[in-house]
């Protein structure tokens, strides 16, 4: 059950930059790390492989590809420039030509399916967006890859909006030239059997055929590469809204096949500073949760990495980082492409990014005739969600104009950062400031608009799970904010990002 986290998107460092302000809006992210607690030793059991590394089972060759010669694979590594160029300043509105990154007006035709293949999905994405597929993989015996992490990033650079869509590895789809299979087998089939464009090509076509989303660029990283990315950035501060406990190898150097080397590990709610190994565990583990919950945590790490890249001045380090990480990340984006995208950083914030997850009710658990447990798409529900994810959001524009200030009125470290992150998921830009006291028993929402827009006020209360009695009218023409939220000891940090889709 290996799955590299989505954070390898540093390969798209221009996209990382284009998602500027991620983490905590205009404010500096809290620096207090959440406690990491070792709970208990692993139970006695018969020796088994690590719960994250089941024995590899060689897949049978797809019958429709028996007569295709397996090619010698060439690496998809980008070519680094001999002497990295400096990042151009972004002091004015970007005038750089992004046309080379956008798709052509006419989308390429979908591959034809067999007579028993389902009808292809209607293409949902237009030429106004640039669509990236972020792939997390580990290399299997024999040199093949299994892509258990797939996140689609849809970027509208001119409109300063983006969407992220997590795809579960067990999604049951039609793979062109192969047939009905789990989506995480598409890349391997494309690599092994000479599909046009290799693994990335077949995965692109599979996503277009089943989800109706055109993929323009891809980036893939393995586990070791992910650790290196995080450590290169000096670690990452991840807002952990809900405590998370799962089995973890006590030390990365220990034998994962010895069950005594595992113990339950807990990350408490708070802003947790993670190195590469801890971030990898947090984003890929699922023994005590599910693939859907893992997708949520992967997007948490991805968002945090975006913000970390900016807070560590990575904009000016893009050429050097590109050179340093070129052997870690396989991508079709060149340094010039990334620098072009980096110019759009000032116009985007974390609140500009909407998070989507292909999970129930968009899929249902199903067992194939061969006995495989998969996730079957619920076509009507899934299509509606994908239409929303691939369309610019007017609600996001409205909410982004609302100024919300967050204060921590308690002695609980990082509470304001968690609330700000929660509002960012819902599309609200936030700013952090110091409270006048740390003994607020109950949270307070000060409405400086004097109820001019009750829908926005009620939305804030709903998102933060606060009662209407928390609202206080406080007209102040010089406030600089529309709403001030002072968090009290009654504030509950845990929330579900999928409930905040807007």
Label the model's feature ranges.
Residues 20-502:
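Non-catalytic, solvent-exposed segments at the cell envelope interface
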Residues 1-6:
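Bacterial N-terminal signal peptides that target proteins for export
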């Amino acid at each position: 059950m290996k799955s590299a986290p989505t954070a390898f998107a540093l390969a798209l460092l221009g996209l990382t930059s284009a998602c500027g302000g991620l983490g905590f809006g205009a404010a500096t992210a809290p620096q207090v790390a959440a406690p990491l607690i070792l709970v208990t030793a692993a139970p006695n059991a018969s020796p088994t492989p690590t719960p994250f590394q089941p024995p590899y089972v060689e897949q049978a060759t797809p019958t429709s590809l028996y007569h295709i010669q397996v090619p010698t694979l060439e690496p998809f590594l980008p070519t680094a420039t001999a002497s990295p160029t400096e990042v151009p300043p972004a002091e004015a509105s970007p005038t750089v030509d992004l046309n080379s990154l956008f798709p052509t007006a006419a989308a390429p035709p979908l591959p034809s399916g067999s007579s028993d293949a389902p009808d292809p999905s209607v293409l949902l994405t237009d030429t106004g967006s640039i669509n990236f597929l972020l792939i997390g993989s580990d290399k299997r015996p024999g040199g093949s890859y299994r892509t258990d992490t797939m996140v689609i990033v849809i970027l509208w650079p001119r409109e300063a909006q983006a969407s992220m869509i997590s795809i579960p590895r067990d999604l049951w789809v039609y793979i062109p030239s192969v047939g009905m299979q789990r989506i995480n087998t598409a890349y391997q089939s494309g690599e092994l059997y000479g599909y046009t464009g290799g693994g990335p090509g077949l995965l692109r076509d599979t996503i277009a055929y089943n989800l109706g989303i055109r993929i323009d660029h891809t980036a893939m990283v393995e586990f070791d590469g992910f650790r290196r990315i995080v450590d290169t950035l000096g670690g990452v501060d991840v807002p952990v809204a809900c405590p998370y406990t799962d089995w973890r190898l006590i030390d990365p150097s220990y034998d994962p096949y010895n069950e005594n080397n595992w113990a339950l590990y807990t990350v408490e709610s708070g802003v947790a500073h993670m190195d590469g190994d801890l971030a990898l565990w947090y984003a890929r583990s699922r023994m005590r949760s599910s693939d859907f919950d893992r997708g949520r945590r992967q997007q948490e790490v991805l968002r945090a990495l975006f913000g970390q890249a900016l807070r560590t001045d990575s904009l000016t380090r893009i050429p050097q980082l590109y050179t340093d990480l070129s052997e870690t990340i396989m991508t079709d984006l060149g340094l010039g492409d990334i620098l072009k995208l980096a110019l759009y950083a000032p116009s985007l914030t974390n609140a500009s990014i909407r998070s989507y997850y292909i999970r129930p009710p968009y899929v249902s658990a199903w067992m194939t005739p061969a006995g495989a447990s998969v996730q079957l798409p619920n076509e009507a529900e899934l299509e509606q969600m994908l239409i929303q994810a691939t369309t610019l959001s007017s609600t996001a524009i409205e909410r982004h104009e609302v100024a919300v200030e967050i204060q921590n009125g308690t002695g609980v470290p990082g509470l304001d950062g968690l609330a700000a992150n929660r509002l960012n998921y819902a599309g609200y830009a936030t700013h952090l400031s110091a409270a006048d006291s740390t003994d607020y028993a109950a949270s307070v929402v000060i409405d400086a608009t004097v109820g001019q827009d009750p829908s926005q006020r009620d939305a804030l209360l709903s998102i933060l799970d606060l009662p209407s009695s928390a609202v206080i009218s406080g007209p102040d023409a010089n406030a600089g904010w529309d709403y001030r939220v002072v968090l009290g000891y009654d504030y509950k940090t845990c929330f579900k990002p999928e409930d905040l889709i807007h």
